[in-house]
Amino acid sequence: MDLRRRALLGVDGLRVLLMLFHTVTRIMAEQEVENLSGLSTNPEKDIFVVRENGTTCLMAEFAAKFIVPYDVWASNYVDLITEQADISLTRGAEVKGHCGHDESELQVFWVDRAYALKMLFLKESHNTPKGPEATWKLSKVQFVYDSSEKTHFKDAVSAGKHTANSHHLSALVTPAGKSYECQAQQTISLASSDPQKTVTMILSAVHIQPFDIISDFVFSEEHKCPVDEREQLEETLPLILGLILGLVIVVTLVIYHIHHKMTANQVQIPRDRSQYKHMG
């Protein structure tokens, strides 16, 4: 019995060690993150990199702002009125994250963890007439804020921490193996734990890739958002039309010049019949 008990204890101890090793390995992997926002020429844009096993597995560049409604007492101290806090993601934020085969996560904390942003990315496969195609998307956003923080909130009623979550989110949909790029502003609505409050998240200057990064610190081919493609078309269309119009004018002038030259070389028939006798 003693030998059997020792064997069982040995197996249990090995399991515990393996679990501890797995936990420590995961924690170390999550800590391989870098905030490279100082490299950005845009002071409002942040750059975050998650690295596992010595290579980049998630890269994210974006500017983020949160519009947060909150209640304050009116001047009569009886009624409540709603104010608005504009909270921007600042440089020097703390960042965490991890990468998986079909699920990756980015977490950002700033202002002494008064604010926290969590972004969850999923990769999934779909059957299409052309065969199976894989895409990735932003599937969940969570924003935690503390309305007792005095920089952005002034005399908030029932001040404290609140959590705002997205619901049924499917944003930034991108073909697998590509990065998502969008300069235009995009808004995501988040339902807050503060009753009847909706937080608006505004993203801009976005460039993200949470899966299948081939080169270290280098984005793969860009998949541009429809808004950027439309704006690019609107910018290039006048140029194309101008070139076509210029070409039409040049062709018209050339044809006119050739026609004028040909008619100038023809014999001119006098209109005065009395001049016919001088011809020949």
UniProtKB/Swiss-Prot annotation:
UniProt entry tagged with the keyword Transport: no
Keyword Phosphoprotein: no
Signal peptide extent: 1-29
Post-translational modification as stated in the protein's UniProt record: Glycosylated.
Membrane protein topology class: Single-pass type I membrane protein
Subcellular location: Cytoplasmic vesicle membrane; Cell membrane; Cell projection, Dendrite; Cytoplasmic vesicle, Secretory vesicle, Synaptic vesicle membrane
Regions of this protein lying in the Cytoplasmic compartment: 257-280
Alphabetical keyword list: Cell membrane, Cell projection, Cytoplasmic vesicle, Endosome, Glycoprotein, Membrane, Signal, Synapse, Transmembrane, Transmembrane helix
GO biological process, one term: establishment of protein localization to organelle
Entry's Gene Ontology cellular component terms: cytoplasmic vesicle membrane; dendrite membrane; early endosome membrane; endoplasmic reticulum-Golgi intermediate compartment membrane; endosome membrane; GABA-ergic synapse; growth cone membrane; late endosome membrane
Membrane spanning stretches: 236-256
Residue ranges that the UniProt entry lists as topological domain Extracellular: 30-235
Function: Plays a role in short-term synaptic plasticity in a subset of GABAergic neurons in the brain.
Family statement: Belongs to the LAMP family.
Name of the protein: Lysosome-associated membrane glycoprotein 5
Underlying gene: LAMP5
